[in-house]
Amino acid sequence: MLAKTSETVVLTIGHSTRTLEEFVELLEAYGVTLVVDVRTVPRGRHNPQFNKEALPISLKHFGIRYIHMPEIGGLRHPKHESVNLAWKNSGFQGYADYMQTQEFTDSLLKIIGLARETRLALMCAEALPWRCHRNLISDALTVRHIKVEHIIGKDSLIKHELNELAHVDGTRITYPLFTKETPQRTLGDFGSS
């Protein structure tokens, strides 16, 4: 008889305008031992407690590790031949384009490896996951059979559901704008650059 293996889970969290104490309280409430910072720019004027220089030191006092993974960060621009036209937000469209790269896949596999070893949370600034690139990262994890849950509050954990715009082919995920009657179009079809 095979032993039951535990499910790999990835949590996500947005630091938002929380105090460091509130943030750590949430991490501790959900047993997080590693924060993976998925911000491209890990600093801000309004919440300096979450800057890359300060946060690792603060978290260490609570026994929580920190790593920064800018290679999976947001702030991506759409490609000219993007197939991810279902996204109206250019930042999400650009990130969906980036998800087609080997760099994204390698970073995602690194996150999965870490999640198999420890309880981690992917962190960005935006509190609401559906307004953040964590939502797209979560889609990519979900199609790889990784359970994703979003930390909203102390008593609020939301299970990630694959975005309805998603088109899945194995572990490849795109967000095309198409119907059964019309073929997929790209930005190039509209003369956009």
Feature-to-residue mapping (PLM):
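Residues lining hydrophobic/aromatic ligand-binding pockets adjacent to catalytic sites
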Residues: 1-193
